[in-house]
């Protein structure tokens, strides 16, 4: 679909500002260089001076030595405040604080005084712990996060964001929910924007070993960021520039579940060029988070190669190139329900189309996935004088996703509420874009102007066949209305007790594998075009800082939208009390998720797929972008030199709020739109910078993810159609992470001994499929399961997430029952008797006797979809690491040894239960890993 003349005119004010400054066509680099010269009072240069650069909060710690001309350079320094200390023989040490807020970087002149009787350090400014910045964010450098115990090697970047950032609700398989939204997060890696989902069931993440530092923006997004902005993770990769001696490491680890890793990295270069390369591999018996605490059919492996090249063509011109290839292969974890699957015999006289089909053991479910990701991102940079920098870059990123069914498709049969069809999928997602930005820093102004044009090429190829013999039965029992297995068509129903099924769908008959059918093949494609233009100026006036920005977005895919988006923020630094007050506002255009976007937008107009979806009359098939207003207010407060606190209140209103639904009862998920969402909440962070080897931080948040029906776009959904607000399944009342870290630096034997400790508390996400009792609340979540037993309130063991069907004979409402194993997974018990994988609870249990060890169930008549839904039980998880750096006390080749324990107490806990989007998942059981690293 081409861009229209009116589309460009609608964002003309922004376009004029861009074209006025740029002659070419979003994000620039995420870092700048710190350059400087060290001299004495007469102006003579001082060679061999030691220059030390630190950020106490993020943990960045770098050291350089001045050359023969007294100059030094720190390349690839993320945007942040820093303190620099210079030491030289015969001179008084000097310390200076400054900030990097632009790719222009900083050029410092450090004048050392000749040493006299006093050796007092000269300090030109203070206030390292607080930032006069209107945007709430979290900074973490590699020096800090390498000692944080992380749960998953295959999604360690997600684990790092979850454990270090307030406002993040942890989910399974590397998925995290930022500030109440499903996955509206984006990564900016060295200026390249990645807005597609990075959960390891969708894509391969950039390897954590390639990351130097991250900044997670939780506040109102600056104008340069678009697409998905609930959380913006700004990542700066490692560089070899300026490292004149080959430096790197070789590592290997082994741990629980047979998990083994191996990897190496190497950095080398000089003042003009540099190269950093890393490669790593993982093989694990627990690759994904399974639906059982016991692990089986959960093997997986992953390989990563990342290379960064920096080269200075001239003192003013340089190029930068990122290249990455990742591949993962993994099994879909099985539950006990997936073992020894019973299904119809497809051959012989008693086959699935006969009047009396035989049921046989068709084996275990064996579904698998393979994902390949390739990424190439070059950038050209030109320094224009001492106050301007121009960047021009591009990137291509491609995900190839394959989902493979079991060798015997009939073995893919799962519980009726989870999987009734066998599927295969080959889906590709290719992003290609060019971007440019111009930065100018002079006086009180820090100006940035930029643009990005990109296209996303989506190709979806799905194959589907029904494997449940009663899903589309031609015949039913005349007395009960229950569908019957067997019979090829309604004309084969003999009459009497067996009559034609009035709910039979002839359009599905050719694709019923239990009756000799074949798979249905769906193919869809589209090209999504996006243009983003922005201008922003950071104005510093005494103790004030003003962020003034304007962004224009054009989205043109299966639908089109334009949006002009003001982004503004104000911060004020009360220096006597080291307090920073801030407020900010952003208008954003939230782009639809690309995963299975074509299927979601066209499924209800497809004759075969439409019956599998809960398509609602009046709902637009095509997903629309979301339009959001968000407001933030917060403060940052330093307490002395060893504690800094940040807090933020957030309020977001989104029109067309995104969620996910599922194709029938299959593993294929896709995005949908609800009418709107209202998300208030708060986020807190406290940091204790390193003092005498000890450091700590705490992050905490509470976010209410309130969504409002009706569904307005996409294929069918399963919840929230009562017209009243509900909490989305990733809503969580409260979560927090406390991290403690200590490093010894005394004595030869103890020097380099360190320990790290995490305490993670989650109050629990919504578990809407859990049966409960409630008949008095109009917004009850318990309607499907509320019944009576002997005149007393009782609960039916059914999935309350899935709307009931109407029995064609009795006209009774029929909900899908839970299996014995599903009840066991949820820790259900009736009158103290627990369910087992093979022994279910009674079909109906008195409400007063129904309990769960893993889910909080509302008291009878106390449940409410908005104010008191069913939730996963709160959990406390403890992780610890201990290690020894340079265990052999060597000078060149240093060996590190460390041991990590995840879930030290072996806590049995769930991430979620029968989530519409992802099913049931347990947290990791106790897992021990030993790692050895050779550094050189």
Residue map of PLM features:
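Transmembrane beta-barrel wall of Gram-negative outer-membrane proteins
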Residues: 254-283, 293-334, 368-391, 566
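Periplasm-facing N-terminal accessory domains of Gram-negative outer-membrane beta-barrel systems
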Residues: 2-3, 12-136, 193
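Flexible loop and strand-edge segments within Gram-negative outer membrane beta-barrel domains
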Residues: 296-298, 316-383, 398-415, 419-427
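Membrane-embedded beta-barrel scaffold of Gram-negative outer-membrane proteins
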Residues: 391-395, 401-403, 573, 614-615, ...
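Periplasmic N-terminal accessory/gating domains of Gram-negative outer-membrane beta-barrel systems
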Residues: 91-113, 117-222, 232, 236-240, ...
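Gram-negative outer-membrane beta-barrel transporters
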Residues: 540-545, 649-653, 672-769, 845
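C-terminal beta-signal and adjacent terminal beta-strands/loops
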Residues: 760-858, 872-877, 884-936
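Surface-exposed extracellular loop regions of Gram-negative outer-membrane beta-barrel proteins
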Residues: 335-337, 558, 572, 576-630, ...
């Amino acid at each position: 679909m081409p861009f229209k003349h009116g589309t460009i005119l609608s964002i003309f004010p922004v376009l004029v500002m861009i074209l006025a400054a740029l002659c070419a066509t979003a994000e620039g680099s995420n870092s700048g260089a710190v350059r400087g010269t060290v001299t004495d009072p007469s102006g003579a240069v001082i060679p061999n001076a030691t220059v030390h650069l630190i950020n106490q909060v993020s943990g960045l710690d770098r050291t350089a030595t001045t050359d023969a001309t007294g100059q030094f350079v720190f390349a690839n320094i993320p945007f942040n405040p820093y303190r620099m200390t210079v030491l030289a023989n015969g001179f008084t040490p000097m310390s200076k604080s400054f900030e990097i807020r632009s790719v222009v970087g900083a050029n410092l002149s450090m004048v050392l005084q000749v040493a006299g009787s006093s050796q007092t350090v000269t300090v030109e400014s203070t206030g390292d712990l607080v930032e006069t910045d209107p945007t709430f964010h979290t900074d973490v450098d590699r020096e800090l996060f390498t000692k944080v115990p992380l749960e998953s090697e295959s999604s360690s970047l997600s684990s790092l964001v979850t454990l270090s950032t307030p406002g993040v609700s942890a989910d399974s398989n590397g998925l995290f929910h930022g500030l109440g939204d499903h996955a509206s997060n984006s990564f900016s890696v060295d200026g390249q924007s990645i807005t597609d989902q990075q959960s390891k069931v969708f894509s391969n993440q950039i390897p954590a070993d390639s990351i130097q530092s991250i900044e997670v923006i939780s506040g109102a997004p600056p104008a340069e960021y678009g697409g998905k902005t609930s959380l913006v993770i700004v990542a700066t990769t490692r560089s070899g520039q300026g490292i004149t001696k080959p430096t790197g490491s070789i590592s290997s680890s082994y741990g629980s579940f047979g998990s083994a890793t191996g990897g190496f990295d190497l950095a080398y270069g000089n003042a003009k060029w540099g190269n950093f390369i890393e490669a790593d591999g993982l093989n694990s018996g627990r690759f994904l988070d399974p639906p059982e605490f016991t692990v089986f059919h959960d093997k997986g492996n992953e390989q990563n190669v990342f290379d960064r090249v920096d080269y200075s063509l001239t003192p003013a011109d340089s190029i930068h190139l990122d290249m990455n290839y990742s591949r993962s292969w993994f099994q879909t974890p099985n539950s006990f329900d997936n073992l020894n699957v019973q299904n119809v015999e497809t051959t012989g006289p008693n086959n699935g189309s006969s009047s009396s089909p035989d049921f046989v053991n068709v084996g275990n479910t064996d579904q698998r996935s393979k994902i390949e990701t390739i990424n190439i991102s070059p950038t050209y940079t030109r320094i224009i004088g001492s106050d301007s920098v121009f960047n021009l870059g591009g990137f291509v990123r491609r995900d190839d996703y394959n989902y493979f069914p079991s060798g015997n498709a009939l073995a893919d049969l799962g519980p009726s509420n989870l999987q009734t069809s066998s599927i295969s999928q080959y889906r590709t997602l290719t992003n290609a874009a060019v971007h440019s930005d111009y930065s100018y820093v002079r006086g009180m102004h820090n100006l940035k102007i930029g643009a990005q044009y990109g296209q996303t090429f989506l190709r979806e190829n799905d194959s589907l066949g029904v494997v449940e013999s009663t899903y589309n039965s031609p015949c039913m029992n005349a007395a009960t209305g229950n569908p019957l297995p067997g019979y090829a068509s309604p004309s084969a129903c003999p009459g009497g007790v067996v009559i034609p099924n009035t709910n039979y769908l002839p359009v599905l008959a050719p694709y019923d594998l239990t009756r000799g059918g074949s798979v249905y093949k769906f193919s869809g494609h589209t090209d999504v075009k996006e243009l983003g233009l922005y201008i922003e100026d950071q104005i510093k006036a005494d103790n004030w800082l003003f962020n003034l920005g304007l962004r224009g977005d054009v989205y043109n895919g299966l639908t089109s939208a334009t949006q002009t988006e003001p982004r503004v923020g104000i911060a004020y630094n009360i220096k006597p009390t080291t307090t920073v007050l801030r407020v900010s506002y952003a208008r954003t255009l939230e782009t639809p998720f690309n995963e299975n976007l074509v299927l979601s937008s066209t499924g209800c107009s497809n004759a075969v797929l439409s019956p599998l979806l809960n398509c609602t009359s009046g709902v637009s098939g095509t997903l629309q972008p979301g339009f959001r207003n968000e407001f933030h207010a917060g403060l940052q407060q330093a307490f002395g030199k060893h504690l800094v606190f940040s807090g933020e209140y957030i309020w977001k209103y989104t029109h067309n709020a995104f969620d996910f639904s599922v194709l029938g009862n299959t593993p294929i998920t896709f995005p949908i739109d609800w009418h709107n969402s209202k998300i208030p909440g708060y986020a807190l962070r406290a940091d204790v910078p390193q003092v005498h080897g000890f450091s700590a931080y705490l992050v905490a948040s509470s976010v209410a993810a309130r969504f409002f029906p009706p569904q307005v776009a996409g294929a069918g959904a399963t919840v929230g159609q009562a017209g009243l607000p509900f909490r989305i399944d990733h809503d969580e009342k409260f979560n927090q992470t406390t991290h403690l870290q200590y490093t010894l630096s005394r004595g030869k034997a103890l020097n380099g001994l360190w320990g790290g400790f995490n305490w993670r508390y989650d109050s629990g996400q919504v578990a809407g499929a859990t049966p409960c009792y409630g008949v008095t609340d109009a917004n009850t979540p318990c309607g499907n399961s509320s019944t009576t037993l002997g005149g007393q309130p009782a609960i039916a063991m059914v999935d309350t997430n899935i709307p009931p069907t109407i029995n064609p004979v009795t006209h009774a409402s029929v909900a899908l029952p839970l299996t014995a194993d599903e009840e066991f997974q949820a820790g259900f018990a009736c009158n103290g008797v627990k369910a087992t994988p093979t022994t279910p609870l009674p079909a109906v249990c008195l409400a007063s006797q129904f309990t769960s060890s893993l889910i909080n169930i509302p008291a009878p008549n106390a449940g409410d979809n908005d104010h008191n839904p069913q939730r996963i039980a709160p959990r406390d998880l403890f992780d610890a690491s201990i290690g020894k750096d340079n265990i052999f006390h060597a000078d060149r080749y240093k060996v590190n040894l460390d041991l990590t324990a995840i879930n030290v107490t072996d806590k049995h806990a769930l991430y979620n239960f029968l989530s519409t989007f992802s099913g049931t998942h347990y947290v990791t059981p106790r897992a021990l890993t030993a790692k050895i690293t050779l550094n050189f």
